[in-house]
């Protein structure tokens, strides 16, 4: 199984207050959040957003089946900065960014055939726009988690450098969990703290 990025983080014990105000800003199906919910023992106050209403509808079904009732879903396009947040600042932001999906290609090798380097650049630009619009909503001592299922440096390490240089967040850990040799998906995670 994959180590969940939320579980490996050493939170500064003094600075943490529960329930942890959390924003999953590219929620899609909410899987990452459900794991975070378990790890943090439900001590979490959650906002979830996605660019598509349909993704949030699926997420509501999944949350309902899992017995998760207390959350605030909303539609937001993070490639722009004109979205409204109920909570101005969060202690934890999870950004499972849209990506090329190159970490899943062991299942669909034909993707490689259609793929162009230009697409990597387009995704990287989109990822930078998304993190640039999410990070300003992180509290001091807050944790920002960046996740992709890509194996490309442009979508991973280069975005990490962008976050460090532009927002001066401190990188706590960064890991590419390689799955392709095990016929599983690869996943990249990076965790930052705003000091």
What residue ranges belong to the model's regions?
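S-adenosylmethionine
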Residues: 1-195
